[in-house]
UniProtKB/Swiss-Prot annotation:
GO biological process, any: cysteine biosynthetic process
This protein's encoding gene: cysZ
GO molecular function list: high-affinity sulfate:proton symporter activity
Annotated region (Disordered), positions in chain: 64-86
Predominant subcellular localization, coarse grouping: membrane
Protein name: Sulfate transporter CysZ
Feature: compositional bias, Polar residues: 64-78
Taxonomic classification: Bacteria, Pseudomonadati, Pseudomonadota, Gammaproteobacteria, Pasteurellales
Cellular component terms per the entry's GO annotation: plasma membrane
UniProt-annotated location(s): Cell inner membrane
Length: 86
């Protein structure tokens, strides 16, 4: 399927004036092909440091507000390299 798609794109790039349109169409077609054919394979069979990450974004309606305040002071232990919790 990939070889056929690439061969057709290569053939259409050789035709004058068609080659001006074929690249944007090929990018859109390749994106649609990847989503249809390969997206589920990569989402379900991941390995590596981001394995099983959820790349589907959902809008979260949250009205929570943090009341945490920070002073901006730097602990002297940071400069010594000792940043363990006290």
């Amino acid at each position: 399927l990939n070889f056929t798609f690439g061969a057709l794109v290569s053939l259409f790039t050789m035709i004058p004036f068609v080659n001006l349109v074929v690249m944007p169409v090929a990018v859109c077609g390749a994106t649609a092909l990847w989503v249809k054919e390969y997206r589920n394979f990569f989402l379900n069979n991941q390995t590596g440091e981001f394995s099983k990450a959820d790349y589907t974004f959902t809008k979260v309606n949250s009205t929570s507000l943090s009341t945490e305040t920070r002073t901006g002071e730097v602990s002297p232990n940071v400069r010594n390299g000792d940043i363990r919790k006290q």
